[in-house]
Structure formats: structure tokens, C-alpha cells
């Protein structure tokens, strides 16, 4: 699969970052991986992270108004995000929007989250440093264990060793344990190939994904 952003999601991210960047926000999540040239799986949301206290509150209305001015429909989402299942406390400093135009919809999340390295600037705007993106992705694989998490981490194994990935995950979430890592790999073994096919992986790509984790402890 080629690594290219979805044009609609890329536009939403670019417009939001143009005003949220002043409050420390940078592109995170699957969109950030694509911006760094890693992976190309379909994504359902746009994640923007800041390490600035009060940044979410300061940017939320600005982002909302700017997207409206750009011709999007924007609604605030009240229910808790699944990100709170990955990192404790996300619901206490975050805002989520549903952004629509014509028949396209994407969820936009503004989140307060610590980072270890300064973001870089790419064509979309500020993007989390790859180490920070990967750290959150591996932590998500361990705690959330969704098929997309394994896809993202397997793609990162082309640039990072297993040891490096574990270290970055522990930097993002120091509470992770060896047992949780092992449980995550056991869950991978139980997942049927059909769940990965939903992300447009071919049978050969699914085999490669499983092989990428073959030497991880279970």
C-alpha cells in the first residue's frame, strides 16, 4: 500500500493545525504515521496533541470556528473517547468534534498529552516527532489491541527494533508491564485474518504482519 493521506482528512488536519499550532498542537496518530511515510491503512479520525496546559480549551473554539468558516459542518461530541482506554485521564483534557462536508465525515480530537521531543513541520503543519508517534502507537497496541494498532506497529518495525519500540512505549506510558506486552501478542495470535482484510491488507501482507511479531515474547 502506498503512503498517502486521505485528501479530506488531510484538509481538515491542515486547517485545524493552522490555528491550533499556536497552542502547541501537532498532528498525531495514524495521520502522523502517514505524514512520516510509515503505513497507509485507512484512518477514521484526526488526532491533534498538545503538551501545553490549557491548550485544549484555548484552541477548541478557534478550531471550531475556523472549520465552520472553511465550509465544514462541525459538531461537538459529548461521549468519552476510546483514547481514555489507552491512556488514563484523556477525558479530563480533550475535545472531540465530528467534521462533515458533503458525504465525508471525520472525527477530530484535540488532546493534552506529554511529548518527549519537539514536533517537526511538514506540509500539513506541525507533526509529532516520529519517536513520540511510535511510542503512543505501541502503547495503544498493548492496552487497546485493535487490529489497526498491530498494523501500525508492524509498519514501524521497518525503522525500529523491537527493543526500541518497547522503550518508546514505556516513555509514553511508564505503567506498562511485561505481562501486558505478552497479553497483547497473545491477542494478536487469536485475531482472525478477516479483521485485517477490513483494512485492505492482502493475504501476503497479513502473513508479513504476523511474521513481524513472531519473535516477540508471549
List where the protein language model places each region.
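Compositionally biased terminal segments of proteins
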Residues: 1-218
Amino acid at each position: 500500500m502506498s503512503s498517502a493521506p486521505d485528501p479530506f482528512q488531510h484538509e481538515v488536519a491542515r486547517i485545524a493545525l493552522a490555528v491550533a499550532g499556536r497552542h502547541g498542537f501537532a498532528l498525531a496518530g495514524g495521520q502522523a504515521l502517514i505524514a512520516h511515510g510509515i503505513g497507509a491503512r485507512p484512518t477514521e479520525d484526526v488526532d491533534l496533541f498538545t503538551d501545553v496546559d490549557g491548550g485544549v480549551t484555548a484552541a477548541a473554539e478557534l478550531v471550531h470556528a475556523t472549520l465552520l468558516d472553511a465550509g465544514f459542518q462541525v459538531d461537538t461530541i459529548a461521549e468519552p473517547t476510546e483514547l481514555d482506554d489507552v491512556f488514563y485521564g484523556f477525558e479530563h483534557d480533550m475535545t472531540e468534534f465530528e467534521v462533515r462536508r458533503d458525504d465525508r465525515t471525520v472525527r477530530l480530537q484535540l488532546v493534552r498529552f506529554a511529548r518527549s521531543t519537539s514536533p517537526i513541520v511538514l506540509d500539513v503543519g506541525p507533526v509529532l516527532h516520529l519517536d513520540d508517534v511510535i511510542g503512543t502507537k505501541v502503547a495503544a497496541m498493548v492496552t487497546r489491541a485493535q487490529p489497526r494498532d498491530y498494523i501500525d506497529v508492524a509498519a514501524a518495525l521497518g525503522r525500529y527494533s523491537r527493543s526500541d519500540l518497547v522503550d518508546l512505549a514505556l516513555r509514553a506510558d511508564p505503567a506498562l508491564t511485561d505481562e501486558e506486552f505478552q497479553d497483547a501478542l497473545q491477542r494478536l495470535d487469536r485475531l482472525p485474518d478477516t479483521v485485517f482484510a477490513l483494512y485492505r491488507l492482502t493475504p501476503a501482507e497479513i502473513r508479513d504482519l504476523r511474521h513481524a511479531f513472531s519473535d516477540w515474547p508471549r
